[in-house]
Amino acid sequence: MRVNNGLTPQELEAYGISDVHDIVYNPSYDLLYQEELDPSLTGYERGVLTNLGAVAVDTGIFTGRSPKDKYIVRDDTTRDTFWWADKGKGKNDNKPLSPETWQHLKGLVTKQLSGKRLFVVDAFCGANPDTRLSVRFITEVAWQAHFVKNMFIRPSDEELAGFKPDFIVMNGAKCTNPQWKEQGLNSENFVAFNLTERMQLIGGTWYGGEMKKGMFSMMNYLLPLKGIASMHCSANVGEKGDVAVFFGLSGTGKTTLSTDPKRRLIGDDEHGWDDDGVFNFEGGCYAKTIKLSKEAEPEIYNAIRRDALLENVTVREDGSIDFDDGSKTENTRVSYPIYHIENIVKPVSKAGHATKVIFLTADAFGVLPPVSRLTADQTQYHFLSGFTAKLAGTERGITEPTPTFSACFGAAFLSLHPTQYAEVLVKRMQAAGAQAYLVNTGWNGTGKRISIKDTRAIIDAILNGSLDNAETFTLPMFNLAIPTELPGVDTKILDPRNTYASPEQWQEKAETLAKLFIDNFDKYTDTPAGAALVAAGPKL
């Protein structure tokens, strides 16, 4: 067994963890496999072996992130820079926490981890050595260590020898905070950050995504302050080195559409864009598996094998997986190391500057076209609007599609004001001569979801330039430029009005959606730059 590799219990004592029985340091996949399937494990610690070779775990009631339980310590480091939930017009999840309450939460987590056998995983967040975070994850649960090993960048032995953590994540999933009411918190569960101590604490929730998205929120704080774009997007690169980025909220198609046999994958969810180009923050993928089929998404299906980790899927007695069963959650997931996808950028997940920027939206109203080409002002408007329908299950309590606006297609993970991300992105796009497009992967007037086949043909037309050469017409009210025809796409669906029994039906729904856009964008009109963008949005 690879135990501690030079990491001593004394080092953990510096974080407040005492009486450590032993440290399993950067465990191998083989060791994690044995640990997860240990028959003596009970509850959510226990893994189940599936017939695809991957282990499956359950995360209990926490089958998605808990944004209402997210807190950031408000102190001299963050007071004037963070985008706070209790200031300004914008709504977000960055609730302030006092240094005193932080110390109490830290005491709960360190008490939980003390006197235990611990898994410690050292990993990088960010493929660019100049700006990456060296993160140390500490947990008592084997599969949580496995999740981290899948999702973050795995250091070489040489890099581990000189590893000095910039950030510590202590996962105390088994502990809760009984004093939450007196402290004015949302519940007994917590996901808390301290930028001065450079630490994240997790209590009460078993959901693996809290570690992944926690570090994304930190990159979203640190990078834009250096002029580097930090983006909730997937990215891939073509044979000629042409890079495309796909922005979108969970479930809109980021992973599916960027995993393309004709292009090499840079990453599926979190990226930076600096003077050298686009780079991945992660070393793995976290794909939704609800209704997954080998026929529709072969690359993702084939990635589910030994070393992949499934979450909240239904495993039958014979070890087979029912991917259609959403009874635990619609947000069933699999994490796997990025090299489980054959067609990836090697050896480092980065490439040149992006020339195509694609905003993915899933419109539950059936109003927006499957694709439109955006002007420079429309690019900023739709980036700041971040419209989609929240799809079932990516957060607790949401089971039906409901319209939502999420600034920069990732408001839940923003640490600075949205306009700061828009400014950095626009500068990067202008320097690279990039063009933006709005792609609707949602529903049309028939009530049917636009097919993956049609959406893939649309993406192909964007990437090969044929969309830029196509004739366009303007969709009224939203003033969006829509191609009259595209190769491989049913022409009838390009104009959303054609999918309704009458144009009046579209008009009625369009007015409802336009009003939602206008009302949402009002929060940006308190600055001259924001007010100037109103004209790029829908008009009633």
From Swiss-Prot:
Its cofactor is Mn(2+). Involved in the gluconeogenesis. Catalyzes the conversion of oxaloacetate (OAA) to phosphoenolpyruvate (PEP) through direct phosphoryl transfer between the nucleoside triphosphate and OAA. Its EC number is 4.1.1.49. This is Phosphoenolpyruvate carboxykinase (ATP). The gene is pckA. Belongs to the phosphoenolpyruvate carboxykinase (ATP) family. It is found in: Cytoplasm. The modification N6-acetyllysine is found at K87, K523.
